[in-house]
């Protein structure tokens, strides 16, 4: 496992280098992928409108507290977590991303394309969905769940319907143990919460 972790760490670093190289190359052709903090005030207002009208209606929200302490996080699905406070009580706000949402949203017109990733819109404006709460830290997360595949499948089973066997195995993954947790930044309260998964 240590070898896997070391290799994965290197692959994540390589992925980041590729992403920034691609971003730089795209900007030469007038396509810019922007973080929310890079937007002008006018662009930020347009991005907020895009979030409120096109993104927010497709997000699933939940507030976890002492009465509702945990939920089942789906395999390979993105979530934004918020450290929420109301009347001196701390809670965790969970915003689940819908697969129907676009991954990039164009802001502004003209020949040059300014694109804001879905994750940036949620990070910048998602706290508005939790009315009545004060939002503190926020953290994007995704879990990978274990998949137990039996290599001793009888040949007659495979001949009958291999796709059905695989479908059942993949579906069972939704209930299995978390083997990887990905977060985009460390917020101590939220990190403490997700480590209980």
Residue ranges of model-derived segments:
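N-terminal non-catalytic structural scaffold regions of very large proteins
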Residues: 1-197
């Amino acid at each position: 496992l240590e070898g896997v972790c070391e290799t994965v760490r290197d692959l994540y670093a390589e992925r980041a280098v590729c992403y920034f190289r691609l971003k730089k190359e795209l900007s030469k052709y007038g396509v810019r992928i922007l973080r929310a903090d890079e937007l002008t005030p006018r662009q930020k207002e347009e991005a907020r409108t895009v979030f409120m009208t096109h993104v927010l209606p497709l997000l699933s929200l939940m507030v976890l507290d002492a009465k509702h302490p945990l939920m089942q996080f789906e395999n390979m699905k993105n979530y934004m977590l918020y450290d929420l406070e109301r009347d001196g009580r701390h809670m965790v706000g969970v915003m689940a991303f819908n697969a129907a949402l676009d991954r990039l949203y164009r802001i502004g017109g003209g020949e040059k394309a300014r694109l804001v990733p879905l994750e940036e819109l949620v990070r910048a404006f998602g706290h508005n969905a939790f009315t009545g709460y004060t939002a503190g830290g926020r953290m994007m997360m995704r879990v990978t769940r274990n998949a137990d595949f039996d290599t001793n499948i009888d040949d007659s089973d495979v001949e009958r319907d291999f796709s059905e066997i695989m479908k059942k195995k993949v579906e069972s993954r939704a209930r299995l143990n978390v083997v990887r947790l990905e977060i985009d930044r460390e917020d101590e309260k939220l990190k403490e919460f997700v480590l209980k998964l």
